[in-house]
């Protein structure tokens, strides 16, 4: 059954992607009045308890204006120089506009490896999570000063989708000059219809976005559908809407034209399915009965409950968790590498800093990174043993 669309303030954590054209005028630079209105919308969402993250384009466009670079395509080094200048301008603009609502902005610049390599992924996620806990609004962009043509996201639609899945967001909003997905290019086909709800991204839906070399894809719809596949598969709903109104989020709430893409499942369920089913464990942790009970009640795995560490693994690698019966009961992402795990196994969390020399995480495997893979109580094994007994009677 397709999930129903909700009001924006009914979501828990929302990632908003903002296109360059919304923020920057090629001749005059930053569109401050639009940015101020956008920040007012963000403040209104936060006042209702919604956590908000922003993926903001515009650094290269702003830097280009400040440096007075000529029109047309930029060389890689020119683009990187423009990004270096523009990132400062962009971060300051967001900080100043959000501060009028007593909101602190935090800048995060990501490269492709920060979401594709698990250790860096965990570090980036931890930083973003801490910013959210401190009440800050993370302003995220690709680090175009070091990204190359070969190693980069290439567009902020897909970057925003990666961020949304990383932080477990339940809604991704893509704001640009496109107000939704149409059955055909509306400027070419007067009969084109806006799809207000997309239950699933099928091959037919992908075809509506155009191929890689189509005119429509150059307008950005293809990358938005790619972003939708990333987000919805991970349990995150997505909205494509126009950012042209001065209060774009308020316009969406008021029923403005947009397309809503239904999520495949909850963020936690989809992510834990990925952990359990697609990754081979690099090692294992054997735990006691008390720790097993804690895990089955939804708690994190603390060092005190770990009795043995097996294998050679790094922080962020997938590991198996072996219960008191000797069977695998769960899988998760390691909060420590194998060497550190061996040092703190069986110890209290308060002792970690003394043993390792730094204040590490309290959990060996955090509950958000853990999925149970065996039923409780050992019922399946017990029934199997009974069956064997009857067979030999």
UniProtKB/Swiss-Prot annotation:
Biological-process GO terms, alphabetical: L-proline biosynthetic process
GO molecular function: ATP binding; glutamate 5-kinase activity; RNA binding
Pathway connected to this protein: Amino-acid biosynthesis; L-proline biosynthesis; L-glutamate 5-semialdehyde from L-glutamate: step 1/2
GO cellular component entries: cytosol
Binding residues for ATP: 17, 176-177
Binding positions for substrate per the UniProt entry: 57, 144, 156
Main location class: cytoplasm
The reaction(s) this protein catalyses: L-glutamate + ATP = L-glutamyl 5-phosphate + ADP
EC category name: transferase
PROSITE patterns reported in the protein's UniProt record: GLUTAMATE_5_KINASE, PUA
Family of this protein: Belongs to the glutamate 5-kinase family.
Summary of the function given for this chain in its UniProt record: Catalyzes the transfer of a phosphate group to glutamate to form L-glutamate 5-phosphate.
Name this protein carries in UniProt: Glutamate 5-kinase
Organism: Sinorhizobium medicae (strain WSM419) (Ensifer medicae)
Lineage: Bacteria, Pseudomonadati, Pseudomonadota, Alphaproteobacteria, Hyphomicrobiales
